[in-house]
């Protein structure tokens, strides 16, 4: 909902407010309870004269005229703005001091002294806790202006402040002033002092005993200066100024700002059903759980305004309201009388309107700053109605978490909790005091509704706006504790800082929810009205009717109206959407209510505050998501609308185009009908011309000569056709002979195949015998080997067995492969021969098709010539029509006819030229007449000649057709015979092929088996190769052992050498057999491919035969169609014979030239076709050759691949052997390294021994030197030498041996 309020702040316009809330028919239920003689009604008018708004409260029974207002009259006080914290240090207000305000039963009567002693004076401590000034003294009922009579002093406009320092009288002084005011009712209005910006004070309330008129000026301003950011908050309700409207709401809706009446004191424990705690929209107090809304606010500015959206979250209407429990429980609806909040009822005398106008029209005075001076004059065009923003933020601009909690908990709740007296079910009759208080509450609430609902006076009844604020304390016990302001400097500073923060928060929210953000915002529509408009009883009735509706119905209807605007959905769809949104809002409301109850129970718990903040943020996110969804739906609906409009526009365009085309078609049909009528007329004229121009026979003879020449050309063409037919027949006979030759060749090939099959069977038997003999020899050799090499059987038996199996299989596979290769070769040769013959047949058939195509071309030429003749005849007819018109009319008629001919013929340039020639020739009318006579004669002769030629052509065509039929029948018979023969041959061939296929399948099966066996053999060979590798290693070991044995068995070495040679030969044979097996595999693959190719070729031949049959059938159909066309041409020629009489010589010459040109073109086209066919054949041959080359290359590549695979295998073996050698070398290296290390160890050991020996020698040498020194006489003694030389030599000998060992 913050999005809405952010936008609501931008729509701050000033409007003049004129309300009249009088006692009308809708208040009868209230007046029933207040059935007192002194009952009164209230007439509220907010009139703006020169920028000064006033609220005038009239007594309906006695409207007294007072004194007039001066132009610079005394201003009225704003509502007092104080700092009342939601959670004080002690957490709550004592229950004893929570008594509500007790209003007098009659506002015009003086208050009783008993009540005046009940209200204690409250003052605010430094910590913001409400403290009782005198705890022992009973609370007094004195009001703020009673306790502070200095408030009644006039406002000093020059200093723009109140002098409150020298005026602090006691209660006795206030009683004196009260009695003086009661006695001397001289003042027409009460002069409330206006507080300055730095010195907020409490407003005063005039004595309620006064009667008359109270004019309250709703002007208040507070300017707050912050050292960091200068912000100004100004509250004003005006009629014809350009000032901002929401200033009072901004000022009073900030969090630290709370409007209180200074005479609202703690209530007693008495039950007061007529005074109910009320939660205002801009109050900063906590949410009253008990004060559930039973009635929505009466009106709103627009269906999308905040108050209309608040209705969505109103609580259910369940509990009945009784007079006893209204005060302290959930159903508190009446508003306490809070002076200074805009609801003050001044009972003073009401001055007349003339006096007020005279007051304002007096001396203008000086323009003063602040609120004291007269407002600046504004143009009447710029004057707008003012409107407060109190309804936008119900708790004021709060910046902390507590305000957000309260705001989220009270989203959607109505600010006006007003009950009619008829809705309250009293259990006992009310006293006069309570009735008076109820009437005061009603007038008080109506004041607020009048102040707030003036902005929507045109569209809907005014919505009540409540300025009173209620604070809930412990549990369900609710109390309205309204504090009096303190005049200390600290409270002033705090208020200024808090108001500044409030305005900043509001501005931030306004910027956050600016239209630049993508979220959808609810527009606020305001309806400005003139300054003299008033609320009529009809509007009040509408307001009451709206209040009688339930909250859910109003909310749903508002949502329905909102969703219905700008959407094309049905009513059901919009209602469903409304229900869904309403259910979601109810869930959100239930959550907010649950969170509100938890907060009321524990107001001081910060954890719950955080949870509620999180819930509030989630709710705002959900609301934003819902708004986004609404935006998307609205956008989608708009897009759908645009698409529908586009589709409609397109449909309209298409319809218009269709209508235009229909009109064009109708016009064209009319033109066609007109042209047909003209053609009929022309034909009739032609017949008349023919009858008239019978004299021109001489001219027609020339044309007959030309026609004879044409006939000669036609005869030559017929002869050429006869020759071509003969050639075709000869070619057909040759084809038949070729077919017979092919059949004979096929029979010969079949005989050859049979012979070769027999030879293959014989070869198979011989091969089998050879294989058996070879097996027997091998068995013998094996027995010899087994007998001779008993010691080596275990190592050699596996290899020999594998070799035997491979040899037997390889022999059988070789034999089978040889037989299959021979068969395949024979089949390939036969297939090649058949292919050659089939190609020859295809060529012959192609030649026949060419000839048939030539015939078709000739027939097409004849058709074209006939069509040309027909066109020329039509042209001649048109020329005759032109001639007649030229005889009758001038050259202009000729040109018109030429234009008509050009329009009829279109883009035919040749015909236009001919028409021009005809127009030039037709200028000489006399010559043309003679020519026409001659032409008539010639045309008659031409008729005869044409008839004869046509008959001849028909006969020739019949002969040709019969010949072609006979030839086709013969060909069909021959083809049938050939087909039958082919079928028989094919059946025989199929049988043979089936047999061969069976054999081939058997061979295939055998080949497959062989392949499987070969695969197994390959696997076995691989295993065998592995085994061979292992055997080779074993053989190497065995060879070493054999070599050892050979040394031992030299006598048996020769036999063993022979046997080893045989084994090597067998191994070589085995390797050769393996290679042959691989080759046989490749050959078998090739054979299978060739067989598949031969099958494909046979299928192609069959398809070609079928194509030939289809082509023959097409030719027959073409012949039939040609016959029909010939018949049609004959009929056309007969029809056109009459038209040829009116033809001319020049036309005939042109026709002949055209025919020659067309024949040349046809010949050139035929040549081009022949060249194209030759080129196509050449290309086909090249393609076949390329295919053969590709196949050969593929075969060569496969062979190369196989060879490469074998090489790779060999290389792999070599690599494996090399790796084994490398491993051996590495092992040998490791052994050598170990040996070297051992030798190094030995060397080190020996060196240590040497060193020890050297040390010993040195030690032995030292005593010998000592002994030599001891012998003085003999340097050398034999004894000494014999003693010491021997060990020295011995030691040196040891050293020498050690050195030699090293």
Curated annotation (Swiss-Prot):
Signal sequence range: none
Biased composition annotated in UniProt, kind: Polar residues: 195-204
Ranges of compositional bias, category Basic and acidic residues: 264-282, 378-388, 655-664, 917-929
Location of region: Head: 1-554
InterPro entries associated with the record: Myosin_tail
Compositional bias segments (type: Basic residues): 366-377
Positions in coiled-coil regions: 604-1258
Known tissue expression: Smooth muscle, spleen, testis, fetal brain, amygdala, corpus callosum, cerebellum, thalamus and subthalamic nucleus of adult brain.
Biased composition range(s): Low complexity: 296-305
Ranges for region Disordered: 75-104, 186-209, 251-305, 364-392, 655-675, 903-929, 1263-1287
Subcellular location as annotated: Cell junction, Tight junction
Post-translational modification Phosphoserine, affected residues: 112, 202, 283, 297-298, 388, 391, 486, 708
GO cellular component: bicellular tight junction; myosin complex; protein-containing complex
Alphabetically ordered keywords of this record: Cell junction, Chromosomal rearrangement, Coiled coil, Phosphoprotein, Tight junction
Protein family according to the UniProt entry: Belongs to the cingulin family.
Role played: May be involved in anchoring the apical junctional complex, especially tight junctions, to actin-based cytoskeletons.
Name of the molecule in the record: Cingulin-like protein 1
Gene behind this protein: CGNL1
